[in-house]
A protein has these predicted regions:
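C-terminal His-loop and adjacent cap/lid subdomain of alpha/beta-hydrolase
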Residues: 1-445
Length: 445
């Protein structure tokens, strides 16, 4: 918030109704048994913050603000998508980074990993580092990046198998090799949650190259007791994540919470018709919120913009053009969850949005930098999806100007969930708040 204050914006923030959670050992489980607070968490708090902030701005400055922008990452990124869907007049522009917009299924993906890495299958931090090193060694430089990179530009083109690190009995690799249960767990990590009865995909898996971020997946054992909050809301605070059934229990969770927590609907027509602009960003080495979920959402936006739902080459180009008129996705090679990772994670996210909203100039490329000890070590362009940066073969490889945004990569399936897991259900009834006639008024700067 402080940074935006230095730019002379009026800034507001919300804890989404979870104030005790920051200090309570139960974390988000403090909302168990409190459905109204769960609605606050899902959507209402952000809209209420927006409306009340505009009232305060008018009272202080004597006039309503003329433009407003939303900025959020992870859960905050998901809130941005909820705003565009449910309250499309709240903001002129939205930056949604690593958006956790599919609440029930992102939690299911976490529980999937908790179960996979439980007990003897748990992977240590040293093993996770060895996995990422092996992944990069096999796949780097084949996807537009440099052969000297220590991250992947497009992990979707990488098919490294964790069996390559399976223990052979040699003493030299004892600390970093993988046992058979660990190999199986890593395969599930990349696969993502599947309904065991129907074989339907519930949610995307994790990308290769994301394994060693922030102690993940080694930290899963401790996270398991504090995360998965929405499961506790339905099954109670004694919920045992080891017993979660990805068929029946998943349906129970979705029946109870999907309409509140999930923003899967790829229909942003009202936001678009109001002139709203959406910038999506997601790190391609994010192990917390699967990048492939955001890619799938954007692909469904493209399909929705063909108007007849067709996805052949001609219609896809038409849908992409229409989508890029109001929404653009920028994938961040080597960037982990919101920031961090080996890739260039320092980016001015807001200025391109402001320029798009206020001057009508849509961003095709955005500069990203890697900064170490206050020094920029290299830069790369972030490219408007579906393009990714490719080294031109000439020029300083540490400079973004030596890369072009190119879309000629062959890519595999983006792990699209089954249709039933993209249904948000009926809109959850949002309790009205007063002074809803705020139309296009926006947060000041």
């Amino acid at each position: 918030m402080g940074f935006f204050l230095t730019l002379n914006y009026a800034v507001a923030n919300t804890d989404m109704g979870t104030a005790p959670a920051a200090t309570d050992p139960l974390g988000g489980r403090v909302l168990t048994g409190h459905p109204e607070e769960q609605i606050d968490y899902a959507t209402r708090s952000t809209n209420l913050m927006t409306v009340r902030s505009k009232q305060i701005i008018k009272a202080f400055y004597g006039e309503r603000p003329n433009k407003s922008y939303f900025f959020g990452c992870s859960t905050g990124g998901g809130q941005g998508i909820h705003e565009a869907l449910q309250f499309p007049g709240d903001y002129d522009g939205i930056v949604a980074r690593a958006p956790g917009m599919n609440g029930t299924h992102n939690t299911a993906a976490n529980v999937w990993d908790y179960q996979a890495f439980n007990g003897p299958a748990n992977v240590t931090a040293a093993q996770a580092t060895a996995i990422t090193t092996a992944v990069v060694k096999q796949c780097v430089g084949k996807d537009g990046g440099l052969s000297s990179d220590n991250f992947l530009t497009d992990p979707r083109d990488c098919h490294w198998d964790p069996a390559a690190l399976q223990c052979t009995g040699a003493a030299a690799d004892a600390a970093t090799c993988l046992t058979a249960p660990q190999v199986a767990a890593m395969r599930k990590f990349y696969e993502g949650p599947i309904n065991p009865r129907t074989g339907e995909r519930i949610h995307a898996g994790r990308t290769r190259g994301s394994e060693s971020y922030n102690g993940y997946p080694a930290a899963l054992a401790s996270l398991a007791t504090t995360d998965g909050n929405s499961n506790y809301w339905v099954f109670g605070n004694d919920f045992d994540w080891l017993t979660f059934d990805f068929d029946h229990d998943m349906d129970t969770i979705d029946d109870a919470l999907a309409a509140r927590l999930n923003a899967n609907t790829a229909d942003l027509e009202e936001f678009k018709s109001r002139g709203g602009k959406l910038l999506l960003f997601h790190g391609l080495a994010d192990p917390m919120v699967p990048t492939l979920n955001t890619i799938d959402y954007y692909e469904r936006l493209i399909t929705s913009q063909t108007h007849d739902g067709r996805h052949d080459d001609g219609k896809r180009k038409e849908g992409l053009r229409r989508t890029q008129e109001f929404a653009r996705l920028f994938l961040q090679p080597g960037v982990a969850h919101c920031n961090g990772g080996a890739g260039p994670d320092a980016t001015d996210f807001l200025s391109p949005l402001v320029q798009w909203v206020e001057q009508g100039i849509a961003p095709d490329q955005i500069l990203a930098s890697k900064i170490a000890n206050g020094v920029t070590t290299f830069t790369r362009p972030l490219c408007s999806y579906p393009a990714l940066p490719r080294y031109s073969g000439v020029g300083d490889p540490t400079e973004a100007t030596s890369f072009a945004c190119v879309d000629d990569f062959d890519r595999d399936d983006n792990q699209s969930p089954a249709r039933k897991y993209l249904d948000d259900g009926d809109n959850y009834p949002i309790v009205p708040i007063d002074d809803r006639d705020h139309g296009h008024d926006h947060d000041n700067r």
